[in-house]
Amino acid sequence: MSTAAKRRLIRDFKRLTSDAPIGISGSPNPDNIMVWNAVIFGPPETPFEDGSFRLTLTFTDAYPNKPPTVRFISKMFHPNIYANGELCLDILQNRWSPTYDVAAILTSVQSLLNDPNPASPANVDAAQLFKENLKEYERRVKKTVELSWVDNADEIEAEVVEADEGSSS
């Protein structure tokens, strides 16, 4: 692994933990600093409000000169998010700059939730609903929010069961 990439990711983690933007959290995988798990909470007063959306960020040795691959693990309904969870976001493609850190990436993703770009759709159905039937789009997004609760509840339940099994041995 590139020492420069590792050093930069450690610096990004320190910044994220000491000065985290509201509604965002993230940390490296304990076994691999090049893979991060993150959570973005839906911005207030948006259809995504109250949602808790999980993502992964996968970095290469070329970071920060090349952007990470960012992918939602949570099911999403959004004009700029592909079915596999990957994003169509300019700063992760043609507008990337090495000055962006993990906090900036996650903040941009959070902003994208409320401010989609239907002109560059990754999900044509979501883009069409957003442009032509906002009420139905918001209804579908609210279902996604409810699914995010179940996603996280399953994960929490699995951790509790694992902890219980570990304490009984």
UniProtKB/Swiss-Prot annotation:
PROSITE patterns: UBC_1, UBC_2. It comes from Cryptococcus neoformans var. neoformans serotype D (strain JEC21 / ATCC MYA-565). Pathway: Protein modification; protein ubiquitination. Catalyzes the covalent attachment of ubiquitin to other proteins. Plays a role in transcription regulation by catalyzing the monoubiquitination of histone H2B to form H2BK123ub1. H2BK123ub1 gives a specific tag for epigenetic transcriptional activation and is also a prerequisite for H3K4me and H3K79me formation. Also involved in postreplication repair of UV-damaged DNA, in N-end rule-dependent protein degradation and in sporulation. This is Ubiquitin-conjugating enzyme E2 2. It is found in: Cytoplasm; Nucleus. CDD domains: UBCc_UBE2A_2B. It catalyses: S-ubiquitinyl-[E1 ubiquitin-activating enzyme]-L-cysteine + [E2 ubiquitin-conjugating enzyme]-L-cysteine = [E1 ubiquitin-activating enzyme]-L-cysteine + S-ubiquitinyl-[E2 ubiquitin-conjugating enzyme]-L-cysteine. The gene is UBC2. Its EC number is 2.3.2.23. Keywords: ATP-binding, Chromatin regulator, Cytoplasm, DNA damage, DNA repair, Nucleotide-binding, Nucleus, Sporulation, Transcription, Transcription regulation, Transferase, Ubl conjugation pathway. One of its GO terms (cellular component) is RAD6-UBR2 ubiquitin ligase complex. SMART domains: UBCc.
